[in-house]
Amino acid sequence: MAPVAGRSYVRRMKPGEHPDFYRFAPPPGTSRESTIRLDAEGKFWHDGERVDHPALEKALHEWIALHPDDGRYILTNGYDWTYFKVDDAPYIVRTLRVKADGVSLVLSDESEEPLAPETLRVGAGDALYVKVKGGKFTARFSRHAQTALAPILHEDKPGVLRLTVGGRDYPIG
């Protein structure tokens, strides 16, 4: 609706903008717990079945958040929310772009952000992990993204890795 001179308009608040949104009881006959699960490869499952609809899977990745009171993983679209299980990391680094001045990560929610090299660490099975979303979440590198790091990844001694970005070296913890 186009603004009309002399009239004021109030934007309607989405439920998710209410300060107590995450404290509201679930709809009658339902629970905030769900059978939705995110596996270590970044694939969503519901009731044991793979979520394979591309638009739904994209939305689920975009809805990942932390409950503000208990810190558990939730999915929220601003109108409702539910808890879900995360097998490993809530985000996956799908691809990366290596530039002379740094590396940018493309995450499973299709967002792009600069790599924070000081937050890199090696986990089980030699998987690489990094902090994302302002350090609030962890992302696991896909095999493709981890391989793309090879040109700037160096092994000084067996098992001791460092990353060279923008002329600086970062040890990987």
Question: Model-flagged regions — what are they?
Answer:
Residues 3-173:
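Terminal leader/tail segments of proteins
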